[in-house]
Amino acid sequence: MKEIGGYFELELHKGGHYHPDALYLNTGRNCFEYILRAKGYKKVYIPYYTCEVMLEPLRKCGVKWEFYHINEDFEPLISYSLATDEAFLYTNYWGLKQACVKRLAERYGKQLI
């Protein structure tokens, strides 16, 4: 099966960048790899409903992963107690799950990707 990529055309706007000191990366996969390397995570919890290419950065960085199930509302079915070298990856499917993202951020803090 061919993956549908997360690359969108470059939008140029007038004025300065919103975050002038930001690091600019070209794909979600590259952003994920950067986070894995920068934070030094050893294990990531990742939803089963995830594009196969998101496993590439995990393999490349030697990071272990464990899949978790989501319910019919695209929310995790289980909560984890994370070690300091672990992270929880959540996909905000179609940008509709802001309340869920907020709950997960309150639970996992900076360990939420």
What are these regions (language model features)?
Residues 22, 65, 110-112:
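Hydrophobic anchor at the start of a short beta-strand
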Residues 12-13, 49-53, 95-96:
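Short, polar loop motifs at secondary-structure junctions
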Residues 71-113:
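Active-site phosphate-binding strand-loop segment of PLP-dependent enzymes
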Residues 1-41, 82-84:
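Conserved PLP-binding active-site segment in aminotransferase class I/II-type PLP enzymes
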Residues 24, 46, 90:
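A short beta-strand submotif of the Rossmann-like class I SAM-dependent methyltransferase core
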Residues 35-81:
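Conserved PLP-anchoring active-site segment centered on the Schiff-base-forming lysine
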